[in-house]
A protein has these predicted regions:
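Cleavable N-terminal export/targeting peptides
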Residues: 1-22
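Transmembrane beta-strand segments of Gram-negative outer membrane beta-barrel proteins
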Residues: 21-33, 95-99
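Gram-negative (and chloroplast) outer-membrane scaffold detector with strong preference
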Residues: 47-113, 119-125, 130-132, 136-140, ...
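Surface-exposed strand-loop-strand hairpins of Gram-negative outer-membrane beta-barrel proteins
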Residues: 32-47, 117-119
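Extracytoplasmic loops and strand-loop junctions of Gram-negative outer membrane beta-barrel proteins
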Residues: 30-33, 108-110, 146
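A short acidic/glycine-rich loop-to-helix N-cap element
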Residues: 40, 149-154
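Low-complexity, intrinsically disordered Gly/Pro/Thr-rich segments
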Residues: 142-149
Length: 167
């Protein structure tokens, strides 16, 4: 009986939330440059959700980007996950870096025909959260995004600007 009580108390202590834990949710306008020298410029929206403990967090990052080069409707979707390291300081300017991996989907349509492909995706980059209000920050961010399919990698750049809600 004594062991059962100690077990219940021990498990209960792990369930108590720590004040250092937080959640960040962001929504941003994103400029996505798909490819290298003959690249396609896409505009879209990206969002992320990060679960943080002090300086370390796990982030999920999702994006939708669109362009219509030469009448072809081109859409890129990204869904990435990975670690985010944040330097938290009292000046309300918190830089971060992240390394993410996941997948992407490219789809193109023209004149009633369409095609799509899925590929492995990864991203490395960072940004800075600039505090505006107690729980709201402005987030400029730049990432290198690689889309890997059939032994080739398409090099992409994503530049974003949005708002973050710190919960």
């Amino acid at each position: 009986m004594k062991k059962l009580i100690l077990l219940v108390v021990g498990v209960s202590l792990f369930a108590i939330p720590s004040p250092a834990q937080s959640v960040d949710a962001s929504v941003s306008y994103s400029y996505f440059r798909l490819g290298g020298s003959s690249a396609v410029n896409q505009n879209g929206v990206s969002g992320s959700l990060a679960f943080n403990h002090l300086w370390f967090g796990i982030a999920g990052d999702f994006g939708v980007y669109h362009a219509t080069p030469s009448g072809v409707s081109l859409n890129t979707y990204t869904f990435l996950f990975g670690p985010r390291l944040t330097l938290r300081n009292p000046t309300h300017i918190n830089p971060f870096v992240q390394g993410l991996a996941g997948g992407s989907r490219l789809s193109a349509g023209y004149g009633g025909t369409s095609a799509a492909s899925n590929q492995f995706a990864f991203a490395f980059g960072g940004g800075v959260d600039i505090g505006l209000l107690p729980h709201i920050a402005l987030r400029p961010q730049v990432d290198y995004v690689g889309l890997h399919n059939a032994g080739q990698t398409v090099n992409c750049t994503r530049v974003s600007l949005g708002l973050v809600l710190h919960l």
